[in-house]
Regions:
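Alpha-helical transmembrane segments of multi-pass small-molecule/ion transporters
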Residues: 1-290
Length: 290
């Protein structure tokens, strides 16, 4: 996964040598939030094909996110976290890295069919929920205006609305060009933001968030998925997606709403590293590739 590590290291090194400042991360995050990610969301909404199995796959993501957030809220209250720490903890404990890590893992283990399932799980499951519930948690208020005016959510809605209209090849090419920049820019911003002392300071909460995110999600998807009659590949890929560590976009929201980005980035970074160890075990447990 060199493509994952390289932009992070590049951002970290360039900050170390004074080429970039930590404060410049917000410019990059705004680029993602207001330009690149809405385009990616538009394309996802425009390409998705609705059907009963699609609804079943999406519902697995919804159930797992709600359960993770419920467990995380109880634990956060027990730890008496501050308001900003609590909201950050809820974000990193509930939403999984189902696109950035989930897509490569799904394709690697289950091929093109697995990738299609992962796209459904991510776009109509994780991304839809983080655009709605995640923004509500991050902003600290049930403000529907904030949610419905959230640029990536608007992109997803417009994509759905225009599903029956084919895109001109030139426009499609331009949109592809922009959406391919999304993940590298987020990773580079992570490199600018990452703070090793911050990881040490938040190690306990980060590990706890990862444990909640992975274990509760896997358990929820495994138990519910057995009863809703998914195809074997859809079930296995949904289980794999449920095992993804904290979502990169949770850290973006933590930055955007001035929560605790050090906790968020520590959770994301540790989660990515740990996923290389535990994901193969999840795949082996759920039956391996097709």
């Amino acid at each position: 996964m060199l493509e994952v590590v390289l932009p992070v290291i590049g951002g970290k090194l360039l900050k170390h040598f004074g080429v970039f400042q930590k404060e410049q991360e917000r410019v990059l995050i705004n680029y993602v939030m207001y330009f690149a990610l809405p385009i990616l969301a538009f394309k996802a909404g425009h390409q998705v094909k609705l059907g009963l199995e699609v609804i079943k796959i999406s519902s697995l993501a919804w159930v797992s996110i709600v359960l993770c957030m419920s467990v995380a809220y109880i634990i956060a209250r027990l730890y008496k976290l501050s308001n900003k720490d609590l909201r950050t903890f809820l974000l990193v404990s509930s939403f999984g890295n189902t696109a950035f890590l989930g897509y490569p893992y799904a394709f690697s283990y289950f091929g093109q069919e697995g990738l299609q399932t992962a796209i459904i799980y991510d776009n109509l499951g994780s991304f839809l929920m983080v655009s709605f519930l995640g923004v509500m948690v991050a902003s600290g208020k049930p403000d529907l205006k904030e949610v419905f005016l959230f640029p990536p959510f608007l992109g997803l809605v417009f994509g759905f609305a225009l599903r029956g209209i084919p895109l001109h090849p030139s426009l499609d090419k331009a949109l592809n060009f922009v959406d391919h920049s999304t993940l590298p820019v987020i990773l580079f911003a992570l490199g600018l933001s990452i703070n090793l002392s911050g990881i040490r300071d938040h190690l306990k909460l980060s590990l706890l968030a990862i444990l909640i995110k992975v274990s509760v999600s896997i358990l929820a998807v495994y138990l519910v998925g057995r009863f809703i009659e998914l195809s074997p590949v859809a079930f296995k890929v949904s289980l794999l997606e449920s095992a993804m560590p904290p979502m990169m976009f949770s850290a973006v929201l933590a930055l955007r709403y001035n929560l605790n980005p050090n906790l968020a980035f520590a959770s994301v970074g540790l989660g990515i590293a740990l996923s290389f160890l535990y994901v193969p075990l999840v795949v082996k447990y759920c039956g391996g590739g097709i």
